[in-house]
Amino acid sequence: MNIIAIMGPHGVFYKDEPIKELESALVAQGFQIIWPQNSVDLLKFIEHNPRICGVIFDWDEYSLDLCSDINQLNEYLPLYAFINTHSTMDVSVQDMRMALWFFEYALGQAEDIAIRMRQYTDEYLDNITPPFTKALFTYVKERKYTFCTPGHMGGTAYQKSPVGCLFYDFFGGNTLKADVSISVTELGSLLDHTGPHLEAEEYIARTFGAEQSYIVTNGTSTSNKIVGMYAAPSGSTLLIDRNCHKSLAHLLMMNDVVPVWLKPTRNALGILGGIPRREFTRDSIEEKVAATTQAQWPVHAVITNSTYDGLLYNTDWIKQTLDVPSIHFDSAWVPYTHFHPIYQGKSGMSGERVAGKVIFETQSTHKMLAALSQASLIHIKGEYDEEAFNEAFMMHTTTSPSYPIVASVETAAAMLRGNPGKRLINRSVERALHFRKEVQRLREESDGWFFDIWQPPQVDEAECWPVAPGEQWHGFNDADADHMFLDPVKVTILTPGMDEQGNMSEEGIPAALVAKFLDERGIVVEKTGPYNLLFLFSIGIDKTKAMGLLRGLTEFKRSYDLNLRIKNMLPDLYAEDPDFYRNMRIQDLAQGIHKLIRKHDLPGLMLRAFDTLPEMIMTPHQAWQRQIKGEVETIALEQLVGRVSANMILPYPPGVPLLMPGEMLTKESRTVLDFLLMLCSVGQHYPGFETDIHGAKQDEDGVYRVRVLKMAG
């Protein structure tokens, strides 16, 4: 952070000579100087180079207009205006709130001015650095001797071993020096919420529009459990999204509560839909409670917002309508919704308090923002028992939290403040929109087939597109008005083979083939469905990566149309079973898997599997207690009907539980098993395409086995 831009030269001695002296003095202070050609060049440079820490310009030539333009990009950036005795100073009180300083053109003053600019630069860096991160930086710079944990002592221990030196050189000194003990009192305590840790949480709450925020250093899986342990006491009833993350299924196993399920929709493509409006009504909840053994009126509700595939709820409507005192929005995938107007009313923290309710929102800061893995946040709006909540927080929080993770969460929040933050999110949205348009253009210009995108026919402007009733593109037959919206940064690519209504064509290209092709070229897909691939356009996606993905898709089309051999097109897949793939070509493989999917009627099978819920024989908590007592046995997956599952069973993708602990498949829900067996059959026919099924293990003979509770007697 040492770059200063100077606008000039001006072609007159009394201006250029003082600036020339100043340049030399600034270089002596450690600054790097650049000379933009004009204001357009300067603004482009600031937009794409956040390391710039100041701008020097002539007031007569640029005045407030340039200041206003720069403020739109970064209102904190120091601006240095040079004036002469005849300059007109038309500056209002509002204008003086800018980081704007004035200097006169004068020879012999360069060193003093450079020292002041160094001071203003230090103030700028201090101003944009959040409190805990600032304190951590200061502590590391002090290089204190410690006789406490961690044992590597700021990386010193690593340098006493050859392999340790490799580790130290890879991660770097500052990373290891910042890994400090909770014994460092000047950094406060994450568990007690004191000192810079408390300042960080208050800073984050203000940034995200929450009344209170908590930093969690071991993932939103833990954040979800913290909220649940506080909000759903033993013996209570919990209203929960069936599309929930497995961490919430684990919560149900830990906590002795009765789950009542909110049943979401999905379309023929396998894309996860939202929970219909009718499910949130009091009449619907009363029916569910009456049909569930031991259930009472729920004290807490959990809703996944957004869905994995990027569908956001009208959260304002849910908060007003859902008649429970506590609502938790699991927003792991959308920590950015507070920072762009298109997401207004679609996040847990949007809007004001709701009388008589407390709203929780958990976010995986690391998923779509610039934070280290496991960085997570809990936001709260409404009245709650802080002491009781903190007990739940401490119950799940290590007494040795990672301070680099804490600093990364806080820095992620700092990056979103002010105009720089708005621009950061807007750039992500615009880049995703541009990518969508490019795929559409290539599809229109392509000879024969090309990929499509799951979106409305017209996407001219950035917005959250409504999943409106009566429209064909989304494939949800009973969509509600003003209820669900597609996030533009969650891009789902469609491959040939099936349309949004589930109609299958004679030929198709299963998405798993495209995912393997891209993976072998260094492009990792977030999620793969039967004929769709999900890509996340986070703030870290730049034009180079977006163009690389486009190039990968066009290369796949070219290779597919040439009908290359598997050996040449997918060498890693070929290595899985060279004998099987020896003479096979890509079109043969694609049509083979496609025919297998058609044979089993995958679209219909998938819809039926998720539509009919298994029978709950006991709660997940009760089933877990049986399992840890050893009252379980292992059976083949084919024998699952009529047995009570000991574990949750979920295929990935989509990563949504099909069967919970304590649930049993019956004749009515037999299609769940048929769907699982169909997924297994693809891997049995084609090596390298085995399905990852959580809760089922494949033995050496290729048989999938699951754990069930022992039958009585």
UniProtKB/Swiss-Prot annotation:
One of its GO terms (molecular function) is identical protein binding. One of its GO terms (biological process) is lysine catabolic process. The keyword Transport does not apply. Coiled coil: none annotated. It is an enzyme of class 4 (lyase). It catalyses: L-lysine + H(+) = cadaverine + CO2. InterPro entries: OKR_de-COase_N, Orn/lys/arg_de-COase, Orn/Lys/Arg_deCO2ase_major_dom, Prn/Lys/Arg_de-COase_C, Prn/Lys/Arg_de-COase_C_sf, PyrdxlP-dep_Trfase, PyrdxlP-dep_Trfase_major, PyrdxlP-dep_Trfase_small. GO terms for cellular component: cytoplasm. Gene3D superfamilies: 3.40.50.2300, Aspartate Aminotransferase, domain 1, Orn/Lys/Arg decarboxylase, C-terminal domain, Type I PLP-dependent aspartate aminotransferase-like (Major domain). Induction: By RpoS-dependent mechanism on stationary phase on the contrary to the second lysine decarboxylase CadA which is not induced by RpoS. Its cofactor is pyridoxal 5'-phosphate. Optimum pH is 6.2-8.0. Its EC number is 4.1.1.18. The keyword Lyase applies. Keywords: Decarboxylase, Lyase, Pyridoxal phosphate. The modification N6-(pyridoxal phosphate)lysine is found at residue 367. CDD domains: Orn_deC_like. It holds the Pfam family OKR_DC_1_C. Homodecamer; built of five dimers associated in a 5-fold symmetrical double-ring. Plays a role in lysine utilization by acting as a lysine decarboxylase. Belongs to the Orn/Lys/Arg decarboxylase class-I family. This is Constitutive lysine decarboxylase.
